[in-house]
C-alpha cells in the first residue's frame, strides 16, 4: 500500500473567483503531490510503523528518528491539504446551527471568531496554517502552526484549516494575505466543519 493523492472534490475552477484554477492546479497537482511522494518515500524505510499518519503524528516521539522530520513535514503536509480541500465549497454555505452556537459560546460572536481567526492567519510569520480546533477539553480554540505542523501533534482535533503558505495565494493575491483570508470565508464548507465538530466532541 501507499499514501495516495486524493482527487479534488470539485473542478479546478470551481472555487473561482476566490481561488483561481491555476493556483488550485499547482497547489494540488504539484505541491500536494510532492508531499505524498515524500511521505511514501519515508514510510518505505520503516514498513513496521504502518501508514496511519494521524496516529503517527499524534505521537511524534515514536516515529523513527531518521524519518521523523520528513513525516512531520510531508505527512503533515498531506494530512493538512487533504483536509483543506474538503473544507472548501463551490456553493456558498451558511454556518450550521451547531457550529454557530459553539462559536458563539467560545468567542462571543461569529464576528469575533472571524476577527481572531483572521488575526491568527495574518500573524503567522512565514509559512504555516491557521486552525479552528477542538482542544483536549472539548472546547473550540483558534491556533496556528508553522510549516506543515499539524494540531494533531498537540492532541487537538482540527475542524477548520487555512493554508497561509504563499503558494496557496500568491498568483492571485500577490503579497496581500488578508484579501486571500477574506476570500476563504466566502467558500467554507460549513457542513464539513459541522461533521468534523460532531466527530471531535
Curated annotation (Swiss-Prot):
Give the EC class as a word. oxidoreductase
* Similarity section: Belongs to the iron/manganese superoxide dismutase family.
Per UniProt, the cofactor note for this protein states:
Binds 1 Mn(2+) ion per subunit.
Q: Which UniProt keywords apply?
A: Manganese, Metal-binding, Oxidoreductase, Secreted
Q: What is its EC number?
A: 1.15.1.1
Gene3D superfamilies recorded: Fe,Mn superoxide dismutase (SOD) domain, Iron/manganese superoxide dismutase, C-terminal domain
- Main subcellular localisation: secreted
Query: What compartments host this protein?
Result: Secreted
Give the protein's biological function.
Destroys superoxide anion radicals which are normally produced within the cells and which are toxic to biological systems.
| Known catalytic reactions | 2 superoxide + 2 H(+) = H2O2 + O2
Q: Which GO terms describe its cellular component?
A: cytoplasm; extracellular region
Q: Which organism is it from?
A: Streptococcus pyogenes
The record lists the membrane-crossing segments as none
Q: List, separated by semicolons, the cofactors it needs.
A: Mn(2+)
Fetch the InterPro entries from UniProt: Mn/Fe_SOD, Mn/Fe_SOD_BS, Mn/Fe_SOD_C, Mn/Fe_SOD_N, Mn/Fe_SOD_N_sf, SOD_C_sf
Q: How the protein assembles, per its UniProt entry?
A: Homodimer.
Q: Does the keyword Ribosomal protein apply?
A: no
Query: Can you tell me which residues bind Mn(2+)?
Result: 27, 81, 163, 167
Gene that produces this protein: sodA
State the name under which the record lists this protein.
Superoxide dismutase [Mn]
One of the record's GO molecular function terms? metal ion binding
Amino acid at each position: 500500500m501507499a499514501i495516495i493523492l486524493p482527487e479534488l472534490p470539485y473542478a479546478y475552477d470551481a472555487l473561482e473567483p476566490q481561488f483561481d484554477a491555476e493556483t488550485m492546479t499547482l497547489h494540488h497537482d504539484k505541491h500536494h503531490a510532492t508531499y505524498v511522494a515524500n511521505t511514501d518515500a519515508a514510510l518505505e524505510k520503516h514498513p513496521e510503523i504502518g501508514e496511519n499518519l494521524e496516529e503517527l503524528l499524534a505521537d511524534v516521539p515514536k516515529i523513527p528518528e531518521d524519518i521523523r522530520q520528513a513525516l512531520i513535514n510531508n505527512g503533515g503536509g498531506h494530512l493538512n491539504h487533504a483536509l483543506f480541500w474538503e473544507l472548501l465549497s463551490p456553493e456558498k454555505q451558511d454556518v450550521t446551527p451547531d457550529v454557530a452556537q459553539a462559536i458563539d459560546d467560545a468567542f462571543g460572536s461569529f464576528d469575533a471568531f472571524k476577527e481572531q481567526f483572521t488575526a491568527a492567519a495574518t500573524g503567522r510569520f512565514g509559512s504555516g496554517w491557521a486552525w479552528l480546533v477542538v482542544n483536549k477539553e472539548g472546547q473550540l480554540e483558534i491556533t496556528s502552526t508553522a510549516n506543515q505542523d499539524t494540531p494533531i501533534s498537540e492532541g487537538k482535533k482540527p475542524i477548520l484549516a487555512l493554508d497561509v503558505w504563499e503558494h496557496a495565494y500568491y498568483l492571485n493575491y500577490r503579497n496581500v494575505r488578508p484579501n486571500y483570508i477574506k476570500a476563504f470565508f466566502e467558500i467554507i464548507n460549513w457542513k464539513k466543519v459541522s461533521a468534523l465538530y460532531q466527530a471531535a466532541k
